[in-house]
Amino acid sequence: MATLETRLAEMLTPAVEAAGYVVWGIEYVQAGKHSILRVYIDSEQGISVDDCADASRQISAILDVEDPISNEYTLEVSSPGLDRPLFNAAQYARYVGEDVKVQLTMPVEGSRNLKGVIDKVEGQMLTIKVDGKTLVVALDNIRKGNIIAKF
């Protein structure tokens, strides 16, 4: 069975793309009685506050009709930002050579939190260099991954 995020992506992507944006990723965070639905959008030109407001109106209209979430939630639409979250193999592959931090579901080498450099992505496996060690992590073992912004 598809996850809620997958179903939401299938539902929202056509309208978001028709408006000129790309759905970078979707997070649904349950926080007691009130949850948060985060939709990250991107485009070649970057994303402005007006773009987020425009996409939010489009997304809200779809969610009001389809009603895929039964409990109360807040919709947040934003750009992925400098420390952008990574959601799939293509996104990790796009940032080969960049610093990344990942939170794992199951520990690798005794750790659930890794910081390192993305070495390569093959299929659904991420190779990351952490403190001189090369580690291979299954993408489905990554709970959360983010680029580490360089200033």
Curated annotation (Swiss-Prot):
This is Ribosome maturation factor RimP. It comes from the Bacteria. GO terms for biological process: ribosomal small subunit assembly; translation. One of its GO terms (cellular component) is cytosol. The keyword Cell membrane does not apply. InterPro entries: Ribosome_maturation_RimP, RimP_C, RimP_C_sf, RimP_N, RimP_N_sf. The gene is rimP. Keywords: Cytoplasm, Ribosome biogenesis. Its main location: cytoplasm. Belongs to the RimP family. It is found in: Cytoplasm. The keyword Cytoplasm applies.
